[in-house]
Amino acid sequence: MRPQSLTPLFAQTTSLPGIGPRLGKLVEKLAGPLVVDLLWHLPFAVVDRRHAPEVAHAKAGEIATITVTVEEHLVPRNPRQPYRVWCSDETGRLCLTYFNGREDYLKKLLPPGEVRVVSGKVEIYQGEVQMTHPDHVVPPDQREQILRVEPVYGLTAGLTQRPVQKAIATAVERSPELPEWQDAAFRKRNKWDGWHAALARAHAPDEETDLSPMHPARARLAFDELLASQLAIALVRHHNRTVAGHVTKGDGRVRTKVLKNLPFELTPSQKAAVGEIEADMAKPERMIRLLQGDVGSGKTLVALLAMLIGVEAGAQAALMAPTEILARQHHATIAPLAEAAGVRLALLTGRDGQKQKKETLQGLADGSIHLVVGTHALVQEEVEFADLALAVVDEQHRFGVHQRMALSSKGHAVDLLVMTATPIPRTLMLAAYGDLDVSKLTEKPAGRQPIDTRTIPLERIGEVADAVGRQIAGGGRVYWVCPLIEESEDIDLANAEERFRLLSAHFPGKVGLLHGRLKGAEREATMAAFAEGRLSILVATTVIEVGVDVPAATVMVIEHAERFGLAQLHQLRGRVGRGAAKSACLLLYAQPLGETAKARLAIMRETEDGFRIAEEDLRLRGAGELLGTRQSGLPDMRLADLAAHAELLQAARDDARLVIERDPDLQSERGAALRALLYLFRRDDAVRTLRAG
């Protein structure tokens, strides 16, 4: 149960003074629904209001706090005109300007003849000193409250600084003193304050440098967040190791048949990955392993060989893909090999006919089907296995944790292999999975040629179209990707449709269009026409599925490449170069290019190594944006910056390991404090869900 002391932090933000239902909705959108969410919403800038000149000495552009006497209100006749309030001190006059100002409100705020302290940005307009909508107007006895460095918080539409500052200040006040969960020697070495003092300090910066992620207060809080995350992962890992697993040993007879039917040798890293998986499956503990392989590195084959270990042991295995296109593709790759090895394989998707579905469900339940490939249809309640030994989940950041769990729970202590084509930098791997066992596929299969990557200004699009014409005349196939502009799906669609129209005029009957609004069946028909060569050019917004395999595709054109992230560019480029023919990737960009965009395109030209590209992407963009953490299954860090805090992440991992060695049930005095930490960062539910791997 959550410690009693944390109760005030887990109240709704509407329990804070000044936050009613309307503001509550906006605050929830900004930071989250609970008081604790506001604690993690740190300021990104400061405003120094300590400068208090007389009117005559106030300079344009500076933030000033000035004490004045209110003289007169000039109420506009026309509501479009500004409302002006003239004030003065001994040195000169100051005009306070309000647009859409209400007379009753302003006369109450600034009563004529009274002294007021105003703070805001100074402007000089037609020789007059002026402030438009001052940030603060208070009586002289509240002057000291304004004369300070003020934190500036990120906002969402409809919110202003004042209520957010007030709500966060109250949230910090309500935060309890908690028992220290950090290792005493480690904290002393870093010269860090206690949790509560660090929190108060992070929300009350004195100058710009206090906003650095390396400032002691911020570093302390970042470490706490990382420790909670690493400890949650380590606890689950420990729990999984103590739960008796399936000992699954194969004798190699089925795999030998498959390997004989391959027209090529496995790469060294494919062999190593299969060896690691085989050793894991033979252990009494449950396997949870990540198979990381760049686009086109042969993950499906490794997955098949892993699944066949289960079949050799007399059990079953399942592979779950995020989309029907991918499930069908995996099935098509595996089917001839399964047939050659005498293994019964089925496909299960949401669009199967009743008769076929019934047969598949029957075969899985009685064990006559050995392998199944499917979409999330596999996790439906009606799906039962006779004896599921291995669950393989492809492109896992598309699945919610509960879907991974659901597939794993279709048997007893099912081994889990998670495949991803997204090369994740080491730091992010550690943050997301702790010490998860990882197999990496680093080489491309034999016979694949390097891709010729070029950057070309958009003005030369005519030459690109001519080059595309030459490619398709020789039987090549071309992807043409139009960028996704986040704000508007309509604009994207218009861009893609316009490009489709222009290319169709050049190459009638040869061009297809693929975008997010097409129904599943239309998308699949278009993809099939392209794969079979009835279409030579496929114009698409970025919905070309990860893993879609068209070996005859030799050219990838990406319009406005400067708008894409590195990981995305790399994923798209991986759609070509999958056959033996020479392939090219043409990155079209609009001038002038910003520094980051320049660096991104340069890296694309230099290397095809997805792991190096991922590290560069982390360096250029920071972890938050890297994979769009929200959809990626990676933890959504509020305080830690994985690029800046890589060393703290390592330290948090080491500390979590030590805790598990010494006190796996968190029963000691420090253990009790660490439980509070897990609740504070809401890792109590993560402890439950992470059992899915």
Show the residue positions of the predicted features:
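Structural detector for short beta-strands of small beta-barrel domains
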Residues: 60-81, 120
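Short boundary/loop segments of OB/S1/cold-shock single-stranded nucleic-acid-binding domains
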Residues: 44-64
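Upstream accessory/linker segments immediately N-terminal to the RecA-like ATPase cores of bacterial MutS
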Residues: 23, 76-261, 629, 662
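C-terminal accessory region of SF2 helicases/translocases
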Residues: 580, 584, 592-693
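Inter-lobe coupling/hinge segments of SF2-like helicase ATPases
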Residues: 267, 272-275, 285-603, 612, ...
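Long, highly charged, low-complexity intrinsically disordered interaction regions
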Residues: 1-17, 25-26, 228-229, 239
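Short, surface-exposed secondary-structure boundary micro-motifs
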Residues: 69, 121-122, 561, 575
